Amino acid sequence: MTKYQPYTVQDVKDSSARELFTVVSTFAGGGGSSTGYRLAGGKVIAINEFVEEAIKTYSTNFPDTKIVPGDIKTLTGNDLLKAAGLKPGELDILDGSPPCSAFSVAGKREKGWNKEKSYSDGMKVENIEDLFLEFIRIAEEIQPKVIIAENVKGITMGEATKKLNEFINAFSNIKPGYHVTYEVLSAANFGTPQGRERTFFICIRHDVADKVGIHMFNANQTVFPNPITPEHISISQAFENLVNDPEEEKMLEDY
């Protein structure tokens, strides 16, 4: 039986201390994707987020990471590079998870495109799907070695594929040139007790790809991992070793 491997915040910090690669994260939220990079040995040196509660959560867990607050539409790549202490082309990974409600199979999809919507904290945003293009603009200004973006599975379905192709073309046009790949991955195949499917884009700068032997004909097979867990882990398996500590309990007062 596959065993769930829990980790602590200290585990994340210890792994990140290896500093195997550098990361700047946009749409960083409370630090979900940043945690993954840290567990892989990465150093997340700066992030962008504009929801105040998410910023508080992030800074509590990772106080050493520089936070560039604000709407990504008002930021430049130089703002993030300055916070990271890097020049264009030096960053290893630029990460981003632009809002995805416009493409979700649970949402209105194309009926909701080009309309005003409420974002994370209730803020009204026009054309929320275009925030993906703002992320690509930042990527073009930073010119990282690798660009990683995440979105819902629905972006690969139906009318949304028009937007998918628009994003792929935009990634492809970033100078000095990138190999653009995407794949739908399920978290359940990688040790997480959740059947969460997401579309991942991984774009590798040509000079970096050449050094490690990645070319357009083999990019998808080379870049994306195979499932690591032969059996999916259930919630009950993940919870079975949790310690019931009454001192750690906190009652929700405002309900």
Task: Please report, for each region that a protein language model flagged, where it lies by residue.
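Class I S-adenosyl-L-methionine
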Residues: K82-L91, S101, V105-Y255
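Core alpha/beta nucleotide-donor-binding catalytic domains of modification enzymes
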Residues: T2-Q143, K153-M157, T161-K162
